[in-house]
A protein has these predicted regions:
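Catalytic Cys-His active-site segments of thiol-dependent hydrolases/isopeptidases
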Residues: 49-54
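CBM-like, beta-strand-rich accessory domains located in the C-terminal region of large
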Residues: 55-261
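Carbohydrate-active enzyme catalytic cores, enriched for enzymes
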Residues: 1-48, 98, 252-259
């Protein structure tokens, strides 16, 4: 429930472009992540724009702040704050359509944001020294509307994404993209949009990001909290290092109503 995926070639994985999307009423409890209205792109069965972070252990600090948390996914932060951990941080898909020529998905994550209030996750956070603070990405909710429209143009590999964003006061909206295999390239030479490209061995995913106003962009290969392998050793007792991933953020000026496309 709350999942969608479209592909260009169901018969040949090696030449197949795919994208997936999640906006689920089950929220982000158990093994689910705080990734409402997030998408991923793939080519040849390998990730392009993709959720980041490492699942070191269920409530490890890195796993909570950089894998489960919203900052790890291709979605939206509000004043740097993400979605709730628990069933309270939910989304849903109120409309969808699928045909040979065109597909459409509407995700609604208007109820996903705010402080962590789940008794279960508050207890787990306390036990694992995970602090649900504004410094770590959780605070009062200001989101009134976050609706993400995605149009899939048949088997062309082209999709159009349009975000409706409304808050109860002026806020900074941040558009997130991540890669795990190769660094992204970011081109800001055109004043109309920002061009971000993700690549893997066989393909590429090009994002052309338009917005209501001027964006401040940042790209980094550092996690918000480091990924330390303290749990899994090989047969020689060596704890292999977890690789860094790449993170792109485009942040708006303060605005109560905003649009990304």
């Amino acid at each position: 429930t709350g999942l969608a995926a479209f592909q260009t070639n169901w018969d040949r994985v090696g030449g197949n472009a795919m994208w997936s999307f999640r906006s689920s009423p089950y929220g982000s409890t158990s093994h689910a992540l705080a990734n409402q209205n997030a998408f991923n792109t793939f080519y040849g069965g390998k990730p392009l724009f993709y959720s980041s972070g490492h699942h070191i252990e269920f409530t490890d600090v890195h796993s909570m702040l950089c894998h489960r948390a919203t900052r790890a996914h291709n979605t939206i932060l509000v004043n740097g704050m993400g979605q709730r951990i628990g069933t309270e941080g939910y989304g849903w898909i109120p409309r969808y359509y699928a045909s040979e020529k065109i597909g459409y998905v509407l995700g609604d994550a208007s109820n996903a944001y705010g402080k962590v209030i789940s008794p279960l996750w508050l207890t787990r956070g306390e036990q694992s020294e995970v602090h649900y603070t504004p410094e770590n990405g959780w605070d009062e909710n200001h989101v009134k509307t976050f609706r993400r429209h995605i149009v899939n143009l048949g088997k062309t590999g082209l999709i159009f994404i349009y975000d409706e964003l409304v808050a109860d006061e002026p806020v900074n909206w941040s558009y997130l993209l991540h890669t795990t295999e190769n660094p992204m390239t970011v081109d800001k030479s055109n004043h109309l949009f920002v061009h971000i490209q993700a690549t893997n061995r066989g393909g590429a995913s090009d994002a052309y990001l338009f917005s209501t106003g001027t964006l401040q962009t940042d790209t980094t290969s550092r996690f918000f909290y480091p990924a330390v392998n303290w749990l899994r050793a090989d047969d020689k007792g060596v704890f292999k290092k977890y690789p860094n991933h790449w993170h792109f953020t485009a942040t708006s000026e303060k605005a109560q109503v905003y649009r990304f496309a």
